[in-house]
Amino acid sequence: MSYRELVVELAREHAEALSDALLELGALSVSVEDADADTPDEQPLFGEPGLVPERTAWQHSRVIALLSPDHEPAVLLAAAANEIGLDATPKFDVREVEEQDWVRLTQSQFEPIPIGERIWVVPSWHDAPDPDALVLELDPGLAFGTGSHPTTRLCMEWLEQSVQPGQSVLDYGCGSGILAILAKKCGANPVVGIDIDPQAVESARQNSERNRAEVTYGLPDACPAGEFDIVVANILSNPLKLMASMLASKVKPGGRIALSGVLARQADEVAAVYARYVDISVWREHEGWVCLAGTRRESH
């Protein structure tokens, strides 16, 4: 079976947002390169370990997305471009790629990730740097959420500070299950994870078993009735806006909600939609992304 690479060249200010949108919409992997590499205009690499980059992408960037055979490159790119607010779909090329052991190639790039005050996300082939910390064992896979993306990190930091033992938590758009697993390890009970992708649901179940975290997972139609003390949703801004009424209704009066997958420039628009139901504001910003957090107003 052959895969396809979608290759897009575009300006720096759109490269990271486009790569994130492509991942959310189903790309197997996405990388950003210097489109001027091996030319006189080539710029130094960014993001070397231990360094804080002065910019998030090269001036002239090349985004390369690996797609499964069932994805139509033009359709996926158009959806991603629309999601990040581009006026038109960028020009692109498509290359055929023979199947390789992508999992092993990807694993070689992952190291333990420290998050917040006491969290470590550790691949199974590594030992935890601090065994006494709050350790989540998680291997990269097709489901979104390894702790490396700013939105996942923001939600994890918020959960670490917010979850109290015995509180009920709903993770809507659970991906790999990383947020649901963390909530359980912070003492939440019960914890429910919901995703539209059956593969993500299965991945999340396996990750929970590996972490000995009892979480109930399912597709949207399996979402239990009733309200939760905490609802967290790390998805894209458009789905968040469309599901505002439903997500807010899952929060108990006085309960809390956290939303991410939202670019800083999208924060006001998303907050305005949720303001009908909850008192909400930007909790924290990181690398151009925000986590919105709020409290559902008490019923009268």
From Swiss-Prot:
Catalytic reaction list: L-lysyl-[protein] + 3 S-adenosyl-L-methionine = N(6),N(6),N(6)-trimethyl-L-lysyl-[protein] + 3 S-adenosyl-L-homocysteine + 3 H(+)
Cellular localisation: Cytoplasm
GO CC terms of this entry: cytosol
Family annotation (SUPFAM superfamilies): S-adenosyl-L-methionine-dependent methyltransferases
Pfam family, one: PrmA
E.C. code: 2.1.1.-
GO MF terms, alphabetically ordered: protein-lysine N-methyltransferase activity
Keyword annotations of the record: Cytoplasm, Methyltransferase, S-adenosyl-L-methionine, Transferase
Gene Ontology biological process terms, A to Z: methylation
Residue positions binding S-adenosyl-L-methionine: 152, 173, 195, 234
InterPro entries for this protein: Ribosomal_L11_MeTrfase_PrmA (IPR050078), Ribosomal_PrmA_MeTrfase (IPR004498), SAM-dependent_MTases_sf (IPR029063)
Organism superkingdom: Bacteria
Gene3D superfamilies on file: Vaccinia Virus protein VP39 (3.40.50.150)
PANTHER family cross-referenced by the UniProt entry: ELECTRON TRANSFER FLAVOPROTEIN BETA SUBUNIT LYSINE METHYLTRANSFERASE
Function, in words: Methylates ribosomal protein L11.
Protein name (record): Ribosomal protein L11 methyltransferase
Source species of the chain: Burkholderia multivorans (strain ATCC 17616 / 249)
Gene: prmA
